[in-house]
């Protein structure tokens, strides 16, 4: 088994697509259904051909409520400072660069999408493997 994608509802598909395009995601496919539901499949360049994020616009499902059960998605970047500058230049408002594990740990920043979903941007320190491993918790 492996994780395929993260999917969540959005209130305005065009607004969300514009936001995620600025972050670096690209459209892989789109499916439209009766009743006005649209599913937009996205990924980042390093994801190759695989969809990693699905935005679901379902106007018939009632008001969008994130609630307190969803925390965030995390996106790995090569250079967090450059990424933050690029996002700001595109009109987005990323959070400050943080060092949650001290100067030898990852650099992180939080970003909110138009619906309030949180995205954690992570730059690993030199020599760290891509992704989170058991060693990160020891």
Predicted segment positions?
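Short glycine/serine/proline-enriched coil/turn segments at secondary-structure junctions
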Residues: 34-36, 63-65, 103
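N-terminal beta-strand motif that seeds the catalytic metal site of vicinal oxygen chelate
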Residues: 1-17, 70-73, 122-138
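Core segments of cupin and vicinal oxygen chelate
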Residues: 2, 7-50
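Active-site/binding-pocket entry motifs
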Residues: 48, 61-62, 127
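Vicinal oxygen chelate
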Residues: 2-12, 30, 40-41, 45, 62-138, ...
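Generic beta-structure capping elements
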Residues: 45, 55-58, 124
């Amino acid at each position: 088994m492996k994780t395929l994608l993260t999917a969540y509802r959005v209130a305005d598909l065009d607004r969300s697509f514009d936001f995620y395009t600025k972050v670096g995601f690209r459209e892989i496919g789109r499916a439209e259904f009766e009743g006005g539901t649209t599913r937009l499949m996205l990924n980042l360049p390093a994801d190759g051909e695989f969809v990693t994020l699905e935005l679901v616009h379902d106007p018939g499902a009632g008001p969008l409520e994130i609630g307190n059960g969803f925390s965030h998605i995390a996106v790995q970047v090569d250079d967090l400072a450059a990424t933050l500058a690029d996002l700001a230049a595109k009109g987005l408002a990323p959070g400050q660069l943080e060092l949650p594990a001290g100067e030898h740990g990852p650099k992180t920043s939080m970003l909110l999408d138009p619906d309030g979903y949180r995205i954690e941007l992570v730059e690993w320190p030199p020599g760290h493997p891509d992704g989170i491993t058991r060693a990160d918790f020891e």
